[in-house]
Curated annotation (Swiss-Prot):
Protein name, entry field: DNA replication ATP-dependent helicase/nuclease DNA2
Record lineage: Eukaryota, Metazoa, Chordata, Craniata, Vertebrata
Main location: nucleus
Reactions accelerated catalytically: ATP + H2O = ADP + phosphate + H(+)
GO biological process: base-excision repair; DNA double-strand break processing; DNA replication; DNA replication checkpoint signaling; DNA replication, Okazaki fragment processing
Amino acid sequence: MEPVSAECQLPPEDDLLEMMMEQSFTEPEEKSKDKSTRKIIPKTKLCRGLNNRYCVLNVKEVYAQGEEKHLTITASQEGDDLELCILKDDWVALHIKPGDIIHLEGNCAFDNTWTISRDTGYLILYPDLLISGTSIANGIRCLRRSVLSEKFKVCDKGSRQMLIGTMLHDIFQRATTRGFTDSVLQELAHHTVHGPKYLKEMYQLKLNQTDVMGEVQEYLPSFAKWAIDFMTHPLNQHQINVTRPTAGDPTEATKVSEFLDIEENIWSPRFGLKGKIDVTARVKIHQKSKSHLKIMPLELKTGKESNSIEHRSQVVLYTLLSQERREDPEAGLLLYLKTGNMYSVPGNRLDRRELLKIRNELSYYLTNVVHKSDNGSKEITLASLPALIADRQACKFCSQMRNCALYSRSVEQQIENCYIPAEMIPVVQKETEHLNKDHLQYFRLWYLMCTLEGNSKDSKMGRKNIWMMSSSEREEDGQCIGNLIRTGPVQTISDGQHLHSFQRKSGTVPATNLMSGDRVVVSGEDKFLALSSGYIKEVKHNNITCILDRSLGKLPEDLLFRLDHEEGGGGLESHLGNLSRLMENSPVSDKLRKLIIDFSKPNFVQHLSSVLPSDAKDIVANILKGLNKPQKQAMKRVLLSKDYTLIVGMPGTGKTTTICTLVSTLHLKTCTSCLVDDHREAAGTHRSHRHSKGTVNLGKQKRQHRVTSTTSSTSAKCRSKTEPAVSAENKKLQKLISGSHVCIMVNGHKTFSQNNYIIFFDNILLLKKLPLHYMCAFALIHHQCFKGCVKSVSLVRELGMSESLFKRLERNQEAVVQLTVQYRMNSQIMALSNKLVYEGRLECASDRVSNAVVKLPHIKTLLLELEFRESQESMWIKDVLEPSNPVCFLNTEKIPALETEEKGGISNWIEAKLVFCLTKLFLKAGCRPSDIGIIAPYRQQLKVISNYFNSLSASAVEVNTVDKYQGRDKSVIIVSFVRSNIDGKLGDLLKDWRRLNVALTRAKHKLIMLGCVPTLSRFLCLEQLICHLKSKNHIYDLPAGAHEHMPV
């Protein structure tokens, strides 16, 4: 009997297998095949071998002796060398379609056929999506919860049990190096509970350190007992059942002989898994007359001793993860810290298979999050999640209940034929009854936009290139530095911060796009993926230093490393977490929904006397001294505000000064504490120096977490808040928060939930405003041309994701005040943005500011030297150096200076050389290196310019992107626009008028721009700039070969 076949999700063209069998090998059919195949194959690297990657070209359901799925697959980017993968048994339920990427485990038959069945092989769907073992284990009972937990990672609220569990993990892990004696355990417990590490969490949960210490001490005898039972007693005294596939008798005596690592971080692109193993231990196993050593994962649990399927599943998954670093452990250990009882968990095929199938389901729902319309329109809608389970009791205590109900009501109830259990409909309705139609629509739209943006960043800059590309390939893109060895000892800065120094095994550090502050992942060259991660501290010609979260000091000295740039996903989890909080049923969220979604008008009090103490008049008058009129108006509006104030801060108008003055004045408001959230690193640092007294600095300061604190002498004038039951050290923190009132660069730290006034710069994404949930009123200080992150999907911009919070709220004009008096730029530089952006509203604060010029003490000597060497080709140089010419645009059209496109990006070598030579001339004229700043929109150009400066002892000359200069200024700014071509290529970076405005407003005394006028004139915003520069005679046409006749 012939098998019956039904095709599933075929590509638009004929079936590829049939086409291969029937084609006459004529040229047109081969072209048709190539077109069909290439349309399906995504732009990703495919390969065979241990870490194979196949692309699915076709899926066919076959009914013979039983249901099967036949997958036509290829490891060729051109679609050649087709292979067949047969899914049998319960693997046929796998959601899979043409274009999907898979990894196969098992044996491929001689006829290039893979068989994945109940007994043989595994298939990993989307293996480059690494999913944690915890998420997979939680998906056993409710897959929907696991999907939501991956999306809304910041929504799980902390609890007493979770905090104490974390502390107990910490104590046990530290004891692995210190010992498990009673005295050591007591010392570790005291240090953990009373130290600063968990102070903020205890404060947030209103916990007393004495009570916490009491709970922790209940576990310590079990720690000691476990160590005696499984570390010090003779091998044959304590037996646990260890069932391993290669073992016979399951009863084996087990002894932990050595601890090799704690919190071992492992990425496994082979199985699509990631995780941190609590403890990695060398275990001595005795069976009958033989004994042998195994390296096993040891999972710690602090809750009830349940030996549950979820707990055991995590251990099974860790046995798979361990194969990335060593041989298959075949089993793992599960230890319950409350009792000291330990169980062996075998990593048998049945459990591994079922868990990998759950992982595949998770990856399907995490990847296929949107539906594109089938009717030819561009409409994109959200897809449904795994079905709700019909278990009210389980849902009642689920941490994702709110998000589950939100998604069901706002998204799934709008999808035709989406199944929702009848008994769960009332539960969903009750959980979301406080939300109206507009709120649900807002949630649906922002979830869609965040999802599209996150998917775009994952596909463009996903971390998969770290394991799919060699270090040499990544070096060509400027995203990696390979062939490194560690030099010198590792310096431990603090817990989780270890300073490492690397140098090239042979030669110097290659030119790279990696810069100070970039996040990196450190791996071995040939193996050991993601050993550690952290941030680059410094890149030099001969070495590179990094601050990493794990010490690599115990690894072999001759081990070769690679440093890969790791681009984040744009904070998707943070945005979705904030979106979820905005929808919660609480007074603060209700107020925010009314202001942000319903556009309720903000409220103001009528008189300052109602918000300031009666004796504060003289103090306020003294504070306001030196402020200009717009700044004083802004101060008054903020003090009168009950909801929010919007401050338009134009470039150089004293936004930082305004913030500092606001903070000082808010000290005087009864019971008012203040958070200041500013993503501009330089401005945040400058402001924290001004407020060195009375500040708490929590957050990322040049990518290094640190806390500095002092109390203000004026804080005694304000009343303390009611203190929770916390210990003396907690009270110190609370006194600091409620007394000194200022928190710089918080970015929404949970500790500060009792603060009730927030001042922050409006970044471009509305959903970044987590600190809003801790306020009763807030002030947005917004530079209307401030450049935030560029959205990579035009559809996302069209849907409205580029809308800032300020833009959304400014329809209520009574809340808006403008700062228009600037102290930075001289009048000619200011005229550029005033003409192009501000419609003449910007004004200089004084004649001194207006007429200021760059100070070049040796300019006369240099000009005499230039006259002596004068040539027709370099006449323009004198005009550029002249202090009384603050604005110069150097047109490179005639040189010519064409751009170069490389894997690492776009650069312009001639512009880079001109920038370098001009900088040397300014230095020779007496300008200080720290007063010169160089800006380019492309990282590749920064790399080229930096290469020139490697030979110049002028390290203080800063070379950076436009975005890095936000909130900062220099006396001299040189801008390289880079783009110069004859084929009309533009790109997106120079199309953004906000980024252009930032570049134009960084210079105080001298602004020099380099670019090709015909090319740049294709950009609308730059065309307007060039027209203005022409009208003012600021454009200098450089002669042919100008870069070859520079007098340096």
